[in-house]
Amino acid sequence: LYNDIILNMNSKYLEKEKVVLKPENIPEAYNIKDLPTIMKDLNDLVGLEKIKEQVNDLVALLKFNKKTNIDIKDFNFHMCFVGNPGTGKTTVARIITEILYNLGYIKQNKLTEVTAKDLIAGYVGQTSPKTFNVVNSALGGVLFIDEAYSITTGANRVAEFGSECIATLLKLMEDYRDKLIVIFAGYNEEMKRFLDSNPGLTSRIGYTREFKDYSIEELLQIFLNLVHRNNMDITNEALEKVKNIIEKSSKSSNFGNGRYIRNIFQKILIEHSKNIEKYNLDENIFFTDDILLIDKDDINYEKLIFEGKDSKKIGF
């Protein structure tokens, strides 16, 4: 830890400059939360009630193991997260990583996020070493493979490389069972086909978690959380406009769920900043709460609506 702190500080300051050790000098991997704080982060997430229940089940098992030292080395803790983009898969993966580290199941508070292109090479014989290097870099923590189904999709040669990647992963998941957790993530149907075509993977995955799309009310709550987290507020009229935009946008086939909400909040903030700039020409004007109040004029319907590729039929 000492060496990591010094390296972190040396990268920011001149060699002879006298500096004071500050919290930001501590590498992220060492900024460890206690378990109650981690569980609060989990429970504060909007929706995901079934996921929270399943994570709590895992916590109960790991806490029992810590108290009794039962033998769980042969348990399968590799996971599969299925659901549309923006439904919280990566966020929950980060929280699970913190939990596993806090309870001593993994050695490092480290989540390594990759996709198929990080695992598969373009030439014969190079995929296995490339996959091995990625797994090796993730040892001691959690390896999160997003859009994992794309490992085995594509033209014949690509599929061949994908099979090599899967074979390597299977061996390493077994060999390093006590040093690595792998989480495969992706769309529901694509992940089902991916697992069905690889029986070896299915047998090594101990948990499958389904992340459902957020309801309109949950999406609106995520938006409000972003507003309040930034010490801002929003008028009822503006909030109603946001709700209407979310309702229409959510009918698109490739709607981004929570990710879309973060994007529209950013766009609304930009519009709000422009409007404040227009009416606040005097830089010395007295600061008022109105500056942090989002109103209907900040909600630009054309910029915020998401049409997507097509629209879902209501009620089907």
Regions inferred by a protein language model and the residue ranges of each:
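The conserved phosphate-sensing helix
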Residues: 1, 49, 250-277
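Pre-Walker A (pre-P-loop) alpha-helix and adjacent loop at the N terminus of AAA/AAA+ ATPase modules
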Residues: 34-79, 98
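Short glycine-rich substrate-engagement loop in P-loop NTPases that contacts/grips substrate
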Residues: 108-138
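Flexible beta-alpha connector loops of hexameric P-loop NTPases
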Residues: 116-127, 150-163, 208-210
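Conserved C-terminal "switch" segment of AAA+ ATPases
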Residues: 103-108, 190-196, 202, 211-255, ...
